[in-house]
Every structure is written in C-alpha cells, then in structure tokens.
Amino acid sequence: MKQSLEDTLLAAIRTIPDYPRPGILFRDITTLLGDARAFRRAVDELVHPYAGAKIDKIAGIEARGFILGGAIAHQLSSGFIPIRKKGKLPHETVRVAYSLEYGLDEMEMHIDAVSPGEKVILVDDLIATGGTAEAAVRLLRQMGAEIVAACFVIDLPDLGGRAKLEAEGVDVRTLVSFEGH
C-alpha cells in the first residue's frame, strides 16, 4: 500500500526537543534529505503546481533553502538565487534588515541576481514566525521581482508566519504542519 505524502514526510522529519534552547521542538529535515524517496516526493510536490509555468528564478534562503531550491530550480529549468546572511556573498549585494527574537540581522543577495519583472518562487525548509521569509520577499521585491509563491516543506501555524506572508500578498505553499513550536 502506498504511503500518503504527509505520512511519508512526517515519518522522515526528525524532531529534536530543547534545541536550540529549552522549550523548542526543532524540526530537522536532514533526515528527510537523506531519505531519497521522501526527498523526491517533497520536491516533486513543491514543483507540481508550477510545472509548465515560466518561472525565471528560484530563491533559496540559507541554508536548507539552498538544497530544496536547487532541486526545484533544476526540475523547473529555472535559475537559482542564494539569499544569505550579510557578508557571505563575494560580489556587490543588496541587503535588507529584519528583526529576530533578540535583535536585528541582515540578509542579502547579489545585486544582479534578479531583473525587474522576473517571476520568482521563494523556498525554505520551514516557516515559523515568517520574519526571515518576509525579509526575503522584501529583498526580492526591492529588486523588482514578481513573487509567484513561497514554498516550504514545514509550516508551524501557531507561530503565524504563513498568515504574515499571505497578508503581504504572497501565495504560500507548505507540505506538512506541526502544531506548537
């Protein structure tokens, strides 16, 4: 009997209690990435709605968004944009500041990574509060990109990130949800 996509993914995602600090349940997709069947099913499911669409670029958020985004870009025959923390890219960059729980951080991409009007899908492994994804959307829009969607394997709906992105007019696609944090 074929296992459902949700069951396959939930079985492949490891939960680590009290990481990176007490009270947090860390959802680790490295086990999913190591499971060839689960990894393929996740990527195929994220790609499916956009197959045949003209998607110019996939933007992946450091670091797990690079892995998923690279696979998605390959399947859609799209270019790939790495979005990284400040100071990690070698060429001239454009950056945006965003709030973290305990302060500010900055993310950036190369200034020539996207052209105005290009259709872009944003990819990361998980959406929690949405702060990082929202900053990435602002960064891409600042350069004139049209955000087609933001795709994540995991949604933590209790933390409100999906709703935050949808309020910004972003179509959000997730594959599985975990209650709590």
UniProtKB/Swiss-Prot annotation:
Disulfide bonds: none
Pathway: Purine metabolism; AMP biosynthesis via salvage pathway; AMP from adenine: step 1/1
Cellular location(s): Cytoplasm
EC assignment: 2.4.2.7
InterPro entries: Ade_phspho_trans, Adenine_PRTase, PRibTrfase_dom, PRTase-like
Keywords (A to Z) from UniProt: Cytoplasm, Glycosyltransferase, Purine salvage, Transferase
Reaction catalysis annotation: AMP + diphosphate = 5-phospho-alpha-D-ribose 1-diphosphate + adenine
Residue runs in coiled coils: none
Main location: cytoplasm
Pfam families, A to Z: Pribosyltran
GO MF terms held by the record: adenine phosphoribosyltransferase activity
UniProt GO cellular component terms: cytoplasm
Key word Cytoplasm present: yes
GO process terms (BP): adenine salvage; AMP salvage; purine ribonucleoside salvage
Sequence similarity: Belongs to the purine/pyrimidine phosphoribosyltransferase family.
Subunit details: Homodimer.
Function per UniProt: Catalyzes a salvage reaction resulting in the formation of AMP, that is energically less costly than de novo synthesis.
Protein name: Adenine phosphoribosyltransferase
Organism of derivation: Chelativorans sp. (strain BNC1)
